[in-house]
């Protein structure tokens, strides 16, 4: 027992020795630190004295302008890339450089997108200027139905919306997918920007149903439809809002670009015409980006319809354009459509149900408009393009006017092809003789009139030279038909229903003139339409 106490005493004495040694070392460390602190304070005082002598010297005061220029140049250098710095310096001098730097600083504060940067699409100056010059437009609700959206695609989409130069918008995201991270990413953005809204759907109701859920969320006066993997140009909503505010548009659409991989890799630009009903009846050329007023949507029968899944946008656009007061086309590519395997941007034939739905949408459109049609079909080899056979309910006589001067073999080919291929029952041919010299020409005229006494006649123009307008105006005086067809004598009819195809358009009150596609002998196109304006 005594031995145990002695051992404990030895342990305690050993601990006391170590503690005393540690205390001594710490005391030495404190003494060294106090010495270093004293030296540092002395050095600081010396530096302050030296600095005072420098800043108070005449040299320092005389070189202040040079130091100011160097300082500002460093700021500009860090703000602008080298090539921009040199370009602005050469074109606008130091003032141009400063203006460019100011715009870029403002841009950095206004456009937070890190992945899909706004300045990848437009000059910084334009972006900043549009933010400062807000159109008096409506609140625009951008509806995006999400479905297992790849997160990198979603991040680009969100950046492209947040970076809009027009600020009066909201983003309505409805999510019917199961992929992890999608909802979290949108909700994280929504926590920073309350204009972004998210709703998790209980079930997938396909694109039409999911889109309609997003429209239900929307509080804006205008709706814009955005696919979940596509990208908006930063100026898209600004141009649309300007058209709405200044032109009273209730339906707006823009040009677009299709890209693969990175947005810079554009594989197709889709430059569209202004609104053309016949174009829309052939193909949904409107597509993206489209905005329409809520009032117009309600007047046209509501949002998208499930029975047209696959061509739900096409069916909606047909209804909206039937009712719209003012349709405006913005001729700028403001929408970037991502092409991926299986997407309609890549090939609509990948989704045959889209084609069937498109045909059904067209038939419903004609029924609403009171337009009689015999058939609507897909044009072979052109997925997404439809052909309408209108019912010919006003089949008047067609007077075919053919100015001719010798070249009798060409004329024979032309006339014989008309009689060989034409299935339209009521037509006449008027050959307008224009100073022919060859006797064979006149013998051929007599033979043709003898072979076709009921619907072929030859009239002789007394004028000189070749004046196509004057010749046809002269021939028209002898025409008995309701429709006039101007035909060159070196053409050949190759399609049986050629007159039916033109008459079914010409009979419509909104149509004044109809043209047919012309081919060269090697089947290349000679003429396929004329644009005005």
Locate the predicted segments by residue:
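Cell-envelope/extracellular polymer assembly enzymes that use nucleotide-activated donors
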Residues: 138-143, 170, 315, 396-401, ...
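Conserved donor NDP-sugar-binding/catalytic core segment of glycosyltransferases
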Residues: 231, 235-266, 491-533
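Short aromatic/hydrophobic "clamp" motif used to bind/position activated sugar donors
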Residues: 223, 484
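Glycine-rich, basic loop-to-helix element that forms the pyrophosphate-binding segment
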Residues: 201-218, 461-479
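Conserved nucleotide-sugar donor-binding catalytic segment
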Residues: 276-363
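A conserved acidic beta->alpha catalytic loop
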Residues: 167, 175-184, 203, 227, ...
């Amino acid at each position: 027992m005594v031995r145990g106490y002695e051992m404990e005493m030895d342990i305690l004495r050993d601990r006391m020795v170590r503690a005393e040694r540690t205390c001594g070392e710490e005391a030495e460390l404190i003494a060294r630190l106090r010495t270093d602190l004293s030296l540092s304070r002395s050095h600081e005082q010396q530096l302050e004295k030296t600095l005072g002598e420098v800043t108070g010297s005449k040299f320092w005061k005389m070189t202040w302008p040079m130091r100011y220029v160097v300082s500002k140049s460093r700021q500009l250098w860090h703000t602008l890339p080298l090539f921009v710095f040199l370009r602005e310096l050469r074109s606008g001098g130091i003032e141009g450089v400063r203006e460019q730097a100011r715009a870029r600083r403002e841009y950095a504060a206004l456009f937070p997108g890190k992945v899909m940067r706004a300045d990848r699409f437009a000059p910084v100056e334009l972006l900043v200027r549009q933010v400062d010059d807000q159109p008096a437009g409506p609140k625009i609700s951008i509806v995006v139905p999400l479905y297992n959206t790849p997160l990198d695609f979603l991040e680009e989409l969100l950046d492209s919306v947040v970076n809009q130069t027009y600020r009066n918008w909201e983003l309505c995201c409805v999510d019917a997918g199961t992929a992890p991270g999608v909802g979290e990413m949108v909700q994280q953005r929504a926590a920073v920007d309350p204009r972004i809204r998210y709703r998790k759907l209980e079930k997938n109701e396909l694109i039409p149903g999911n889109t309609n859920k997003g429209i239900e969320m929307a509080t804006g006066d205008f709706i814009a439809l955005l696919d979940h993997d596509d990208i908006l140009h930063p100026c898209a909503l600004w141009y649309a809002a300007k058209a709405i505010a200044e032109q009273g548009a209730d339906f707006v659409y823009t040009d677009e670009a299709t890209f693969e991989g990175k947005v810079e890799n554009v594989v197709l630009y889709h430059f569209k015409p202004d609104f053309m009903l016949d174009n829309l009846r052939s193909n949904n050329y409107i597509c993206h980006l489209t905005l329409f007023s809520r009032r117009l949507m309600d007047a046209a029968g509501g949002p998208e319809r499930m029975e047209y899944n696959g061509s739900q946008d096409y069916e909606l656009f047909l209804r909206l354009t039937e009712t719209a007061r003012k349709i405006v086309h913005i001729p700028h590519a403001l929408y970037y459509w991502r092409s991926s395997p299986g997407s309609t941007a890549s090939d609509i034939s990948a989704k045959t149900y889209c084609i069937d739905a498109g045909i059904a949408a067209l038939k419903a459109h004609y029924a609403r408009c009171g337009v009689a049609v015999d058939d609507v079909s897909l044009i072979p080899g052109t997925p997404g393009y439809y052909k309408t056979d209108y019912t010919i309910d006003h089949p008047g006589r067609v007077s075919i006017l053919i100015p001719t001067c010798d070249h009798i073999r060409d004329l024979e080919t032309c006339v014989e092809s008309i009689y060989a291929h034409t299935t339209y029952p009521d037509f006449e041919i008027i050959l307008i003789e224009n100073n022919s010299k060859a006797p064979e020409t006149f013998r051929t005229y007599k033979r043709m009139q003898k072979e076709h006494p009921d619907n072929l006649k030859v009239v002789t123009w007394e004028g000189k030279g070749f004046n196509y307008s004057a010749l046809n105006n002269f021939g028209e005086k002898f025409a008995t038909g309701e429709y006039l067809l101007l035909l060159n004598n070196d053409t050949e009819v190759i399609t049986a229903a050629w007159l039916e195809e033109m008459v079914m358009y010409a009979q419509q009150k909104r149509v004044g003139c109809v043209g047919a596609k012309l081919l060269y002998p090697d089947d290349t196109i000679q003429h396929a339409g004329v644009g005005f304006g």
